[in-house]
Regions:
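The conserved cystathionine-beta-synthase
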Residues: 17-35, 82-100, 107
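Tandem CBS (Bateman) regulatory domains
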Residues: 1-13, 52-82, 88-97, 117-137
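A positional/architectural concept
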Residues: 5, 9-39, 43-48
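Structural motif
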Residues: 15-16, 38-39, 48, 73-74, ...
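A glycine-centered beta-loop-beta connector
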Residues: 31-34, 39-55, 96, 104-120
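Short, flexible active-site loop motifs that bind/organize anionic cofactors or intermediates
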Residues: 14-17, 46-47, 62, 82, ...
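Short hydrophobic/aromatic-rich motifs at helix boundaries and adjacent loops
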Residues: 1, 28-29, 43-45, 63-65, ...
Length: 137
């Protein structure tokens, strides 16, 4: 199976980030505009976390908070698990499966340069990633 970097090349460029002081509402607007399910959280150029659709569901909606009054810094996932572009896709899929996550930051030399994302359909990530990665083996 190929490397994380191989799959990210197929996916194309692009990551988006917000600051901890951004409201959840503003972050959701950006996610809808860009049709993405997660945002990196950046504090003065330093990667400090990730905000995902699940964070919104579990930490805002189910807690009775409002998206316009809640800041990303209050609910983001701090110190999320990450992978390297040089990691094998098998490792990436295993981490995502074992941790029940769909978005995982890809970190190289301390910098986050991408987010690897699993499709929402159960099992589709393995099939799609294996099909694409086999081209690089």
């Amino acid at each position: 199976m190929g490397k994380v970097r191989d799959i990210l090349q197929i996916k194309g460029p692009g990551t988006f980030s917000v600051q901890p002081a951004t409201t959840v509402y503003q972050a959701l607007e950006l996610m809808v505009e860009k049709n993405i399910g997660s945002l990196l959280v950046d504090d003065q150029g330093k990667f400090v976390g990730i905000f995902t659709e699940r964070d919104y569901a579990r930490k805002v909606i189910l807690k009775g908070k409002t998206s316009k009054d809640t800041m990303i810094g209050e609910i983001m996932t701090e110190n999320p698990v990450t992978v390297s572009p040089d990691d094998c896709m098998d490792h990436c899929m295993e981490v995502m499966t074992n941790r029940f996550i769909r978005h995982i930051p890809v970190v190289q030399n301390g910098d986050v340069n991408r987010v690897a994302t699993a499709p929402s359909a159960p099992g589709a990530n393995c099939v799609r990633w294996q099909a694409n990665a086999s081209r690089f083996c």
